[in-house]
């Protein structure tokens, strides 16, 4: 039979392998390769020197790189019996299968006659690149030798010659953890990440995959570092660290004390440096460092917010702004140093705003919603806890009126605020004496108005632990509340960071450990994460600094 060639469809046939439970399975080639991009390579038998050194090990070592180029499955076909194959099948990136009779090798036309040596029919050394069963690359060696480098070069060349729209469609399916390898492959592939059509396509596919897996993705700050994490919402939730986010080279890595999210952009406040802050798009790997104005205010504290002026219908073209509020802890003093400043990305200038507040912003963190920022607040000279919210409008650069919360928090009652995918405001009301937990969500919200609906009420003996939370968010689709927390020992001392998962519908709570922090005073922070295609503008003379979106943890 003529050897298989480019353009042919790979024939079907039966092959065998041992599964993870060491059970022998016999399946068809088509069941493994249909609808996928697959590398099928063959060796004459287990452990001949040429195959072991130049062929099998090469595919094992390059498996992740090949998969970053869009390969879904790597299959090694040998003429040995399946029991011999188990000896070299420990690697999870390559599937080792057996064609002991040589029937499938003969269907491919790649048999090697060695009957004169008493070995019967064996396979030539070969490698095929299949796309939905169709052969697009063939590489056949002699005596078992087959160049992995040549196949990888042909694979990359073949993909790079594809039309742009088709190439974008293929690479947009590559999982995020392989994206750094993709970007480093060639200039053309790296350039795709600056294309609006590609980034939107990739984000859409990533979000669809996340929904299918019932996974919630979030930004977590702990120990002054920032991580991308995912929570699998199953019967028993689990948490996975997807990567450590980094906006600088390792040699320059800084500690981050606060993170503020706005439509996929992060505003990062440095732990040990008041002279600058950084705005960061983790998805595009872009940063912009901004010098701050020094303020002599020993007893003051600073609150930051990141937002947009809504002057453009195209979100990717809107220019961000930063608000910094400097206020004093003593809310009953008449002579309080106050300063409201706004930074404009286009002009690269800080401007002082003329604000005479009759309110006091209670929450340390603001919430981004449709380009504006909302805080928990109260009347400036009133007693009590948070009982209102107030909005800063980044388009008009002014505050709106105080908007009442649907409850009043006094004494052993507490209120915390968050947002739902930056579309709604949520308020968590905690009553320590009655062991009640209420979650409210806005049905309408803008600068001047807010209406609320109760999302759920929950009785919980864990309330005393939840009271110490700093941040939370709600995942409406999976019907859970995600809360940052710290655990305590029997003496009441802080021990380790954790994530609390509250299911209001099932009336249950799970705790997921994050580990013991190096600094017990650094409270973990959580916020939902959705990738952004917004390009970060640089100030005049500046240059966009691009890094990989995250390092695999």
Curated annotation (Swiss-Prot):
Belongs to the peroxiredoxin family. Prx5 subfamily. This is Peroxiredoxin-2A. The active site is a conserved redox-active cysteine residue, the peroxidatic cysteine (C(P)), which makes the nucleophilic attack on the peroxide substrate. The peroxide oxidizes the C(P)-SH to cysteine sulfenic acid (C(P)-SOH), which then reacts with another cysteine residue, the resolving cysteine (C(R)), to form a disulfide bridge. The disulfide is subsequently reduced by an appropriate electron donor to complete the catalytic cycle. In this 1-Cys peroxiredoxin, no C(R) is present and C(P) instead forms a disulfide with a cysteine from another protein or with a small thiol molecule. Its EC number is 1.11.1.25. Signal peptide: none annotated. It is an enzyme of class 1 (oxidoreductase). It comes from the Eukaryota. It comes from Arabidopsis thaliana (Mouse-ear cress). NCBIfam families: F_box_assoc_1. Keywords: Antioxidant, Oxidoreductase, Peroxidase, Redox-active center, Ubl conjugation pathway. The keyword Isomerase does not apply. GO terms for biological process: cellular response to oxidative stress. GO terms for molecular function: thioredoxin peroxidase activity. The gene is PRXIIA. The keyword Oxidoreductase applies. Thiol-specific peroxidase that catalyzes the reduction of hydrogen peroxide and organic hydroperoxides to water and alcohols, respectively. Plays a role in cell protection against oxidative stress by detoxifying peroxides. May be involved in intracellular redox signaling. It catalyses: [glutaredoxin]-dithiol + a hydroperoxide = [glutaredoxin]-disulfide + an alcohol + H2O. The active site is at residue 51. Residues 4-160 form the Thioredoxin domain. Monomer.
């Amino acid at each position: 039979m003529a050897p298989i060639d480019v353009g042919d469809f790979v024939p079907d046939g039966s092959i065998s392998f041992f599964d993870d439970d060491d059970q022998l399975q016999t399946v068809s080639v088509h069941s493994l390769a249909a609808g996928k991009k697959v590398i099928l390579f063959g060796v004459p038998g287990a452990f001949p020197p040429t195959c072991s050194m130049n062929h099998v090990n090469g595919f094992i070592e390059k498996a992740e790189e090949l998969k970053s180029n869009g390969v879904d499955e790597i299959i090694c076909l040998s003429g040995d019996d399946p029991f011999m194959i188990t000896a070299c099948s420990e690697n999870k990136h390559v599937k080792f299968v057996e064609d002991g009779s040589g029937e499938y090798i003969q269907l491919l036309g790649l048999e090697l006659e060695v009957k004169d040596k008493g070995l019967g029919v064996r396979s030539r050394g070969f490698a095929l690149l299949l796309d939905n069963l169709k052969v697009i690359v063939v590489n056949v060696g002699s005596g078992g030798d087959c160049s992995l480098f040549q196949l990888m070069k042909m694979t990359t060349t073949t993909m790079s010659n594809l039309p742009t729209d088709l190439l974008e469609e293929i690479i947009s399916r590559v999982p995020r953890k392989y994206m750094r390898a993709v970007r480093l492959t060639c200039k053309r592939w790296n350039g795709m990440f600056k294309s609006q059509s590609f980034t939107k396509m990739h984000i859409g596919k990533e979000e669809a995959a996340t929904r299918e897996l019932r996974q919630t993705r979030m930004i977590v700050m702990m120990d002054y570092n920032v991580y991308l994490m995912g929570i699998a919402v199953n019967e028993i939730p689990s948490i996975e660290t997807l990567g450590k986010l980094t906006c600088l080279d390792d040699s320059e890595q800084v500690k981050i004390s606060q993170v503020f999210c706005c439509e996929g952009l992060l505003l990062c406040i440095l732990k040990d440096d008041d002279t600058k802050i950084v705005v960061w798009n983790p998805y595009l790997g872009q940063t912009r460092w901004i010098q701050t104005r020094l303020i002599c205010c020993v007893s003051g504290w600073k609150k930051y917010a990141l937002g947009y002026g809504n002057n453009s219908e195209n979100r990717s073209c809107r220019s961000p702004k930063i608000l910094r509020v400097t206020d004093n802890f003593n809310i009953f003093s008449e002579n309080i140093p106050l300063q409201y400043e706004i930074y404009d990305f286009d002009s690269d200038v800080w401007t002082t705003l003329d604000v005479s507040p009759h309110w006091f912003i209670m929450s340390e963190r603001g919430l981004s919603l449709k380009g504006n920022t909302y805080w928990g607040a109260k009347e400036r000279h009133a007693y009590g806890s948070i009982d209102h919210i107030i909005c800063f409008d980044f388009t008009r650069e002014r505050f709106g009126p105080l908007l009442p919360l649907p409850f009043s928090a006094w004494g052993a009652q507490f209120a915390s605020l968050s947002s739902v995918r930056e579309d709604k405001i949520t308020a968590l009301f905690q009553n320590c004496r009655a062991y009640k937990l209420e979650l409210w969500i806005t049905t309408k919200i803008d600068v001047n108005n807010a209406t609320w609906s109760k999302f759920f009420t929950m009785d919980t003996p864990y309330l005393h632990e939840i009271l110490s939370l700093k941040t939370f968010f709600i995942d409406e689709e999976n019907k859970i509340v995600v809360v940052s927390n710290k655990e305590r020992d029997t003496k009441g001392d802080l021990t380790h960071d954790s994530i609390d998962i509250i299911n209001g519908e099932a009336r249950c709570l799970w705790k997921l450990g994050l580990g013991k922090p190096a600094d017990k005073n650094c409270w973990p922070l959580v916020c939902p994460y959705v990738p952004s295609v917004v390009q970060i503008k640089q100030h005049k003379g500046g240059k966009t600094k691009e890094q990989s979106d995250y390092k695999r943890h």
